[in-house]
């Protein structure tokens, strides 16, 4: 078989397969062009889920008549001129493929007029032939009419889903773009019916209203605002408190320099930040905006531009984990901001404190101090209020300014102990335990290189490992919190992480899991009856404990019942 050059029509249709997957792909590419053209208002009209017609009109800069023909050709763009421009790209589009790819699989008409121009011009691509531009009445901006998508590629058209399904994909695309371009007005019509109208949002409240309309009221009610900058990176946006989770990762929006991305490194970093507070099988919700010097991120990874590649992935990962963990730590029980560290005005009588994490010492205990006279203080000074009684040695009943608070004693004490153990571990360090029989491991060349490069890391993680020949290592000591069983697999998994990602969190996760187990077993168990003073001390500890609203397994530690809620239940005032 001889090698032959593909004709332009075939080449364009193959290229279109990478850019135009479905009607939503067309909408994404065309709206991004409108945004790059500084449009303040973008209207999208859809017929039959986009298979029949997609019409996008904007009030942007418009296209010069002499550029109309070039606009429909492949690799023609106004965004970049040379390869070096990719190092500082700030526009959403830059590849010069969108219009050519769309016109290769549809009947496309483009009409545009620049500011101060006497008239607009229209150009069409019919049967793969670009027609000569002709004058046409048109307001400032550009209108692109795409009809009969995939009419010339029946196999692609067969794979389209129902109009309702395709329209939902289009809607999600517009919502994603609306979440990163608040000053732009967006209108979406389907079958001549208005579905979405996002007005320009120039204030914080306006932006929050747009987020609420997309992610929902419940998200905004539980959202924590975040703004964190460090070493040239900035993270802004909103993250949901750990108590608000989803069964699916459907409310996760991450933007890099204003561009929506799906990035495994970012997703894993954010999940790691929620690790201590996320219930098994649940997913966090967030809308976050990462700002980074364009020179440190490559967006030219895939034609859809959903994937990015960072020059220093570890730098970005560590920053994201630290930023989100810091924000989550501010969500103390009953409040949406950090409490003062001092609670001297109450002087709790019971100290819930762990014993040092060193070898040979036992579990945690309640250390009873000399009781102080209990006096009722003003309720609103403490978000969790003041203890009233205990129910069956399980739940603490408390009264605060809003009404009744019910606290799960075991879950609350478990979180308090866990956070104190983690803090003490960071201060005292890991205790190590010698293996009765050292473990010999044979490593491949990549694993040997990873081990030699990261010897200091293994030492910090609590391992004593030595070289044992050119391709072997011997493990002599390990963190005492980890059981010797499966240590070989753990070390190999860590080396695999270091080879693939140049970082690992496996050992830290195992150690935290061990601490969580210790805290769970050491915490007060039902039925256990406390005095009022002991209940008060537990409430005060909860208020100053990070993630005090959730136990180590992600379950809630307390529940608020407002007076109004109780009045409604008992039909008071009706």
UniProtKB/Swiss-Prot annotation:
Cysteines paired by S-S bonds: none
Matches recorded under SMART domains: DNA_mis_repair (SM01340), MutL_C (SM00853)
GO biological process: mismatch repair
Database matches in SUPFAM superfamilies: ATPase domain of HSP90 chaperone/DNA topoisomerase II/histidine kinase, DNA mismatch repair protein MutL, Ribosomal protein S5 domain 2-like
Signal sequence range: none
GO cellular component, one term: mismatch repair complex
Keywords: DNA damage, DNA repair
One MF annotation (Gene Ontology) recorded for this entry: ATP binding
Keyword hit for Nucleotide-binding: no
Keyword Lipid biosynthesis attributed: no
UniProt cross-references to InterPro entries, sorted A to Z: DNA_mismatch_repair_CS, DNA_mismatch_repair_MutL, DNA_mismatch_S5_2-like, HATPase_C_sf, MutL/Mlh/PMS, MutL/Mlh/Pms-like, MutL_C, MutL_C_dimsub
Gene3D superfamilies linked: 3.30.230.10, Histidine kinase-like ATPase, C-terminal domain, MutL, C-terminal domain, dimerisation subdomain, MutL, C-terminal domain, regulatory subdomain
Protein's job: This protein is involved in the repair of mismatches in DNA. It is required for dam-dependent methyl-directed DNA mismatch repair. May act as a 'molecular matchmaker', a protein that promotes the formation of a stable complex between two or more DNA-binding proteins in an ATP-dependent manner without itself being part of a final effector complex.
Family that this chain belongs to: Belongs to the DNA mismatch repair MutL/HexB family.
Protein name: DNA mismatch repair protein MutL
Organism of this sequence: Coxiella burnetii (strain Dugway 5J108-111)
Gene this chain is encoded by: mutL
